[in-house]
């Protein structure tokens, strides 16, 4: 016995709805989470560089040749130490490389690195907004496909 045309149309619509929902949850939401996680890591790096800039500026203001401080050896185990010369600092460049720089050179490096990280975070924010727009567009398409009415959006 043949399936009535209306029933086939309903089944085809239901199949399309399932495919769109799967695409939203399996692809778009996963991509959005990856972009947001990457942006959070960039923000963490940026915060570390800004903290380093504050330390360097304090060192320049203090103008001492020797520095007494505590160093974390890991697991919150601190030891007292003396830094005999504060005119130079080792800065992590990335990928396990460190470079000895003067305080002025380190500030220039931090400014450049901060601007690059800010630009990267802005691009990641734009990417996340694009993905959110695609999700919203697909949800609107699903709403129309299912014949649902417009519901007022709740304010967050």
Curated annotation (Swiss-Prot):
Query: Would the keyword Transcription regulation be found if you checked this record's keyword annotation?
Result: yes
Q: Which GO terms describe its molecular function?
A: chromatin binding; transcription corepressor activity
Where does this polypeptide localize? Cytoplasm; Nucleus; Cytoplasm, Cytoskeleton, Microtubule organizing center, Centrosome; Cytoplasm, Cytoskeleton, Spindle pole
Just give the chief location class.
Answer: cytoplasm
Q: Name one GO cellular component term.
A: chromatin
Biological role: Involved in gene transcription regulation. Acts in concert with the corepressor URI1 to regulate androgen receptor AR-mediated transcription. Together with URI1, associates with chromatin to the NKX3-1 promoter region. Negatively regulates the transcriptional activity of the estrogen receptor ESR1 by inducing its translocation into the cytoplasm. May act as nuclear chaperone that facilitates the formation of the NF-kappa-B enhanceosome and thus positively regulates NF-kappa-B transcription activity.
Q: What is this protein called?
A: Protein UXT
Give the gene symbol: UXT
